[in-house]
Amino acid sequence: MRKKLTALVLSALPLAAVADVSLYGEIKAGVEGRNYQLQLTEAQAANGGASGQVKVTKVTKAKSRIRTKISDFGSFIGFKGSEDLGDGLKAVWQLEQDVSVAGGGATQWGNRESFIGLAGEFGTLRAGRVANQFDDASQAIDPWDSNNDVASQLGIFKRHDDMPVSVRYDSPEFSGFSGSVQFVPIQNSKSAYTPAYYTKNTNNNLTLVPAVVGKPGSDVYYAGLNYKNGGFAGNYAFKYARHANVGRNAFELFLIGSGSDQAKGTDPLKNHQVHRLTGGYEEGGLNLALAAQLDLSENGDKTKNSTTEIAATASYRFGNAVPRISYAHGFDFIERGKKGENTSYDQIIAGVDYDFSKRTSAIVSGAWLKRNTGIGNYTQINAASVGLRHKF
């Protein structure tokens, strides 16, 4: 059996050399714990005696137990390659797949960034499941590894990161500047989806309202502009969809940790556009990144929605240890032309990576996320994780 395996490996080596195929990936997992804290403030009427009824405030607080589990932190495996076609032209391809060392996970190949394309002096043209410009920019602002992409990563801030089935063009670099454009056809955009839920009637009986699947949104357009000069780097990312299936409900779903395509499409909007500006500086062991994001949309009744957010990450290498901290803040949002009072959120993630070697590291982090949901109301998530990461 060993002889057969050896022969198979040796016979594959010349093929790999000719085709220029690379195998790469990351295996990362660990132990995570989290709990939720809620506060609900309600105004109620009470009997005030001779003065009649008066309003009193009822404050309800709830706290979940700490839930601990062994989780995969986003392991994946990938293959990529290229072929020289002559005259400076190359064929390029990549196939990436999520894997899980904690069991379960994806059931189909190519569920991460996977594409085929051409590269040359004109730039690079790719078609397939290609990361958008927001996903590119997030590599600097959110380097955290975790199974909890809402609290232990900047999941709310990164809700527009995606790898849609699309075609993307990246230009060559000119004096430090480069750009890109990306097109997602309507057939590949996400469908509007309202999940099933229960409602109470006057007799307090629960009635199930079934899920509703709507039509896809519209074509989606992305664009990006990059600049790099020494240790300084900047990125601008833009998204536009005339009819979009992301909105207020999707924002809430991201808060509770849902990451499926269906969960992202629950509130059809018009003229949805997102702008994100990211800047970074790297010198020696110091890494700094700042980002600001503006999310704009319209409703069917012509009223407007908007959210404004900022995020920052800083790290510094001390020998084998890299301590890091991130902060994100979302200002009170505007919904249907009206400002939502006390609807902001704050998030802090702190941790350290310790490198045993160039490819293997221990990763430790703690996270705190508080989302205000009205005057006197909030949802808070506390999380911590410790794990191991190996790159190959």
From Swiss-Prot:
Identify the keywords attached in UniProt to this record, alphabetized. Answer: Cell outer membrane, Ion transport, Membrane, Porin, Signal, Transmembrane, Transmembrane beta strand, Transport
Q: Name one Pfam family in it.
A: Porin_1
Transferase in keyword set: no
Q: How does it sit in the membrane?
A: Multi-pass membrane protein
Q: Which residues form the signal peptide?
A: 1-19
CDD domains per UniProt: gram_neg_porins
Give a Gene Ontology cellular component term annotated to this protein: cell outer membrane
Asked if the keyword Cell wall biogenesis/degradation belongs to this entry, the reply reads no
Which PROSITE patterns is this protein grouped with?
Answer: GRAM_NEG_PORIN
The biological processes this protein is annotated with in GO are: monoatomic ion transmembrane transport
Give GO terms: molecular function aspect only.
Answer: porin activity
Q: Which cysteines are joined by disulfide bonds?
A: none
Compartments, as annotated in UniProt? Cell outer membrane
Instruction: State how it assembles.
Output: Homotrimer.
Q: Which PANTHER family match?
A: MAJOR OUTER MEMBRANE PROTEIN P.IA, PROTEIN YDDL-RELATED
More about this protein: Present in outer membrane vesicle formulations which are used as vaccines in human.
The entry's function note states: Serves as a slightly cation selective porin. Major antigen on the gonococcal cell surface and it may have pathogenic properties in addition to its porin activity.
Protein family membership: Belongs to the Gram-negative porin family.
| Protein name per Swiss-Prot or TrEMBL | Major outer membrane protein P.IA
The source organism is: Neisseria meningitidis serogroup B (strain ATCC BAA-335 / MC58)
Gene of this entry? porA
